[in-house]
Design a protein with these regions (language model features):
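Extended, non-transmembrane interaction/recognition domains
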Residues: 42-48, 52-353
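A positional/structural detector of protein chain ends, strongest at the extreme C-terminus
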Residues: 1-3, 393-394
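Sequence contexts marking disulfide-bonded cysteines in secreted/extracellular proteins
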Residues: 29-31, 35-40, 143-145
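C-terminal single-pass transmembrane alpha-helix
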Residues: 344-394
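N-terminal signal peptide
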Residues: 2-32
Length: 394
């Protein structure tokens, strides 16, 4: 009995050490709530505080700043934010900043795929159509509430544009949705692809719903993901594609994609990870899912384009590492985007070492039974034959 109590106490202490207190603030320090558009969340842990800034000003972006526990946000220069002014510091803290990182949906485009092979060819004449994110019309933020809650979410929805070149995308009430979520402890997301998250990570989702393709019915969609980080000393990232036999969390997907700095091991290291899959219906039916293929990773030369992430990280240069990764949706023979008019993709971004998925007890037990029973039968057969082997006739 005593041993059980000790075990429970140890588990409780470990859980409490990893758990964070979440507090959400919608448009902090902003007098005119209609012209702000920022969700700010603090995640207070036992050793540090993570400050999350989510916004679509300029481009959809998620900025994460790590500080000591006693360092607090003291002001936001909303005038500079509204004027897209990179020269003036936007966020000010009462104490030091340990590290900061960001993920930006820096480009979004439609690409022509006439052979339905999900192969993006940027050199093809009229092969791509970029959506100008600067002119997207975003609704008021949905969510961004909670004080001491176990989860905070915020959704940004664009349902129109000021660009005449792009207004056709929204002719069927189409929307572009940017959803962010953090949780106070570790676990797997309830929705496919059931990404593993920690209390030091955020989950980011991009959804393209009922858009009207402008390049014809044979097109797909792709986007550029810009990664920024000031905790990296060598300024470069590594992309890892690991194959696993375990698809219990993401049926039919046996690959994990991770972006991280292989030479960093400190807790300030920043990483991304996702499953290379895009779902084509609200129910996230496995049979309707398609690939989310990585095309290239290059230094993000254009990362200075204004958004909430560059508003902060421009003042952390020149030690900011950057990388731009192109991700394209589609699989060979999938019927293109217009078949379902739906595409959703998710990733996780966090501080610390890249978390490793572990095979669950369920899979271990099933594997043990699956391999163990045939082994027992084979061993029993060998023993039986050995014991009942007929004597050779003389």
């Amino acid at each position: 009995m005593f041993e059980k109590l000790v075990f429970i106490a140890v588990l409780t202490a470990a859980y409490a050490a990893d758990k964070r207190k979440l507090t959400a603030h919608l448009n902090p320090f902003c007098g005119d709530k209609q012209e702000c558009g920022l969700c700010y969340v603090t995640a207070e842990g036992s050793n540090d505080t993570l400050h999350y800034f989510w916004s679509v000003l300029g481009a959809p972006a998620a900025l994460s700043i790590q500080t000591p526990l006693d360092s607090q946000l003291t002001s936001i220069s909303w005038d500079a934010l509204r004027k897209h002014n990179l020269r003036e510091p936007i966020f000010k803290f009462s104490g030091p900043v340990l590290s900061s990182s960001a993920v930006v949906i820096s480009k979004l485009w439609e690409y022509n795929d006439p052979d339905n092979k999900a192969k993006m060819n940027a050199t093809m004449k009229n092969g791509t159509h970029n959506i100008d994110e600067r002119h997207l019309l975003w609704r008021s933020i949905e969510g961004c509430v909670g004080n001491g809650s176990s989860m905070v979410t915020a959704t940004f929805v664009a349902n129109g544009t000021n660009s005449t070149d792009d207004e056709g995308f929204f002719s069927r009430n189409g929307t572009i949705e940017f959803t962010l979520k953090i949780q106070d402890t570790d676990g797997h997301d309830t929705q496919l692809p059931h990404l593993f998250y920690t209390s030091s990570s955020s989950q980011i989702q991009l959804s393209l719903l009922s858009l009207s393709p402008q390049l014809g019915k044979t097109s797909q969609f792709a986007f550029e993901l810009t990664v920024l980080d000031d905790s990296s000393r060598n300024g470069s990232y590594r992309i890892s594609n690991e194959t696993t036999f375990d698809d219990e969390y993401t049926p039919g997907v046996f690959t994990n994609v991770a972006v991280f700095n292989a030479q960093e091991n400190s807790m300030s290291t920043f990483y991304l990870h996702w499953k290379p899959v895009c779902y084509r219906d609200p129910g996230r039916t496995v049979t309707l899912s398609v690939d989310a293929a990585i095309y290239n990773s290059t230094p993000a030369a254009s990362w200075w384009t204004f958004n909430v992430a560059t508003a902060w990280l421009a003042h952390r240069a020149p030690k900011v590492a950057s990388s731009a990764i192109s991700v394209a949706f589609g699989s060979e023979g999938d019927g293109w985007y217009q078949e379902n008019g739906f595409a959703t993709w998710a990733m996780s971004a966090g501080f610390g070492e890249l978390p490793q998925e572990h095979v669950s007890a369920t899979v271990l037990s099933v594997t043990s039974v699956g391999l163990g029973i045939p082994a027992i039968v084979a061993l029993g057969t060998v023993i039986y034959v050995s014991l009942h082997k007929p004597e050779p006739k003389l």
